[in-house]
């Protein structure tokens, strides 16, 4: 009798776990249908170089567009705790991960918004990081040309603004097929 009860409990637990996995996979896949690009994490090895290139100063406002899991926001917070940090993420799963990872940060210093970066006002940004596909980069350039604060510094990983010349290109000296090959720095 005890063995039957144990097997039934294990069976129910396996069913619950399988259902949870299916829900997470469906949630993830459906978020990809409505997002302009999938979530691709920034390689850990390049994060310090991104933070260095941003050169975030106290009191500045930093935007991470397509902030994914919040990795860049947390690195910037560790480097410059007196900056205001804003992450914008459209896809649900990375958004929730970023919210969870930044839950202990002061709300006046770090915020995660679930929104389209093209529909948010970006005019308060002093610094910005992007790791976005070319189609979205083209749309973002048009938006920034209209509303960027003079002096805005944008650091882009791998992808470029086709119609804007970077003020600096940093070769990250990564293996040929690895993500995170170059940082392009733009000034508006």
What are these regions (language model features)?
Residues 151-160:
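Conserved beta-strand signature within the Rossmann-like core of class I S-adenosyl-L-methionine
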Residues 58-68:
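Conserved class I S-adenosyl-L-methionine
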Residues 160-188:
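Active-site capping/gating segments
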Residues 71-81:
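Conserved SAM-binding loop of SAM-dependent methyltransferases across substrates and taxa
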Residues 84-89:
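Conserved SAM-binding motif I beta-strand of class I
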Residues 105-117:
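Conserved SAM-binding strand-loop segment of SAM-dependent methyltransferases
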Residues 2-57:
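S-adenosyl-L-methionine
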Residues 98:
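Conserved SAM-binding loop
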């Amino acid at each position: 009798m005890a063995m039957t009860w144990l097997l039934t409990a294990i069976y129910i637990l396996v069913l619950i776990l399988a259902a949870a996995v299916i829900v997470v996979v469906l949630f993830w896949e459906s978020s990809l249908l409505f997002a302009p690009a999938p979530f691709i994490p920034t390689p850990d090895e390049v994060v310090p170089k991104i933070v260095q290139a941003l050169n975030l100063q106290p009191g500045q406002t930093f935007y991470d567009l397509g902030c994914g899991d919040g990795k860049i926001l947390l690195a910037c917070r560790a480097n410059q705790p007196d900056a205001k940090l804003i992450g914008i993420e459209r896809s649900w799963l990375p958004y929730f991960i970023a919210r969870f990872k930044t839950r202990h940060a002061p709300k006046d210093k770090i915020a995660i918004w679930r929104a389209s970066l093209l529909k948010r006002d970006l005019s308060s940004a002093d610094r910005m990081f992007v790791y976005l596909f070319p189609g979205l980069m083209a749309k973002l350039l048009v938006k920034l040309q209209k509303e960027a604060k003079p002096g805005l510094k944008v650091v882009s990983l791998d992808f470029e603004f086709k119609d804007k010349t970077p003020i600096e290109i940093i070769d990250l000296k990564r293996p040929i097929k690895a993500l995170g090959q170059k940082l392009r720095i733009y000034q508006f």
